[in-house]
């Protein structure tokens, strides 16, 4: 079996460091908002070249509290994509706002900035571009529309830690960048975790208060907040991992290019596209293929841990029925959900494993075509 991700292999390379860091936290007696969280926030600010970061309980909370900090709520609209994980729109719903969907670019899987202006109404307050699979969005075009219409921008970077657009870190273009440290992420903890980044001190202070029950001073509460604090153990683990992230991302890129080489003569496999002047960090290596569901089943039977991210676009999910956005309204998103499949991708993946994955995928596609022709 070749899994989609193998966390155990990564742990084997840094396990002693992680265990030492965790034991130091346990011995310290400081488990919430202690020195590791503070140090990690500063290290992430340095890594991103932004003024502030705030550690949180999850990427979902990062999106939620970013919206709260910008006073977005009931009656407001937020433009985003339907081809993403539900947390993006979940956060919009939690604050009482309405998600408005625009379609994606067929090749990059990201928000198509040329379709933004048609979605703007007097109620539009923000845009949430999602840097899906580690691929940066076209931030120049998105920021130009946002500036023209005086809209906030919250970047969903949960799959794109370390990705670059024209040499600048994604997550530092808008009002906020939001990260997830879910264990499967490029920079993953060993539990839940998240973070916002911003260079606006007032926005930072608002999130600091919101994450801790709505108050900056203990037992003094200025508004309804939440309990969304990155705990010390996760912060300590992430501090061990952060110095490795550039090398891990480079390994992912190397694997992606090798996959591209292995698939170059197979017309049935459309490999990922990269925008010019971007640095994709390949959280997923996602291709488009014919007979996707049949091929996926065959791959699983043959021990290849391929996954479908995502099989149903958000506008067609039950949770968003109330929006009245029917089938056919986002044709590219809908088409891609029927064709995309993500192949094993993690830094420790070997070339031998990649060759096995590639040959198996090509064989499964050929077999599925033969079945369809009968």
Which residues make up each language-model segment?
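N-terminal "arm"/small-domain region of PLP-dependent enzymes with the aminotransferase-like
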Residues: 1-30, 35
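PLP-dependent aminotransferase class I/II
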Residues: 8, 37-43, 47-51, 114, ...
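Phosphate-binding glycine-rich loop
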Residues: 30-77, 90-95, 101-103, 168
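Structural detector of well-ordered beta-strand residues that form the stable sheet scaffold
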Residues: 54, 79, 100, 152-154, ...
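Conserved G/P- and acidic residue-centered "switch" motifs that form tight phosphate/ATP-binding loops
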Residues: 59, 96, 156, 185-186, ...
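PLP-dependent aminotransferase-like
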Residues: 68-157, 164
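Conserved active-site segment immediately N-terminal to the catalytic lysine
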Residues: 155-188, 217-222
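Short beta-strand-to-turn element immediately C-terminal to the catalytic PLP-Schiff-base lysine
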Residues: 179-180, 194-199, 239
């Amino acid at each position: 079996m070749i899994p989609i991700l193998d966390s155990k292999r990564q742990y084997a390379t840094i396990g002693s460091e992680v265990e030492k860091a965790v034991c130091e936290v346990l011995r310290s007696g400081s488990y919430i908002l202690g020195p590791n969280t503070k140090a990690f926030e500063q290290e992430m600010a340095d890594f991103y070249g932004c003024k502030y970061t705030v550690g949180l309980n999850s990427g979902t909370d990062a999106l939620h509290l970013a919206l709260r900090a910008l006073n977005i709520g009931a009656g407001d609209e937020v433009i985003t994509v339907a081809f993403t994980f539900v947390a993006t729109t979940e956060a919009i719903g939690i604050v009482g706002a309405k998600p408005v969907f625009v379609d994606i670019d067929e090749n990059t899987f990201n928000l198509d900035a040329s379709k933004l202006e048609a979605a703007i109404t007097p109620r539009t307050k923000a845009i949430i571009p999602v840097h899906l699979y580690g691929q940066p969005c076209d931030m120049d075009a998105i920021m130009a529309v946002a500036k023209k219409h005086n809209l906030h921008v919250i970047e969903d970077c949960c799959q794109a830690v370390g990705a670059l657009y024209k040499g600048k870190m994604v997550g530092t273009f808008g009002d906020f960048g939001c990260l997830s440290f879910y264990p499967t992420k490029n920079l993953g903890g060993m539990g839940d975790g998240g973070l916002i980044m911003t260079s606006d001190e007032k926005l930072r202070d608002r999130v600091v208060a919101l994450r801790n029950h709505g108050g900056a001073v203990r037992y003094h509460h200025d508004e309804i907040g939440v309990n969304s604090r990155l705990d010390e153990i996760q912060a300590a683990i992430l501090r061990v991992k952060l110095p490795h992230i550039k090398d891990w991302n480079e390994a992912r890129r190397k694997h992606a290019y090798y996959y591209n080489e292995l698939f170059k003569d197979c017309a049935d496999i459309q490999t990922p596209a990269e925008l010019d002047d971007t640095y994709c960090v390949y959280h997923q290596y996602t291709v488009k293929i014919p007979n996707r569901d049949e091929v996926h089943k065959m791959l699983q039977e043959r021990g290849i841990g391929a996954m479908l991210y995502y099989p149903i676009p958000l506008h067609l999910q039950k949770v968003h029925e109330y929006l009245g956005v029917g089938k056919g309204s986002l044709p590219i998103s809908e088409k891609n959900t029927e064709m995309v499949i993500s192949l094993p991708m993690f830094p420790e993946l070997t070339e031998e494993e990649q060759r096995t994955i590639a040959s198996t995928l090509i064989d499964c596609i050929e077999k599925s075509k033969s079945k369809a022709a009968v």
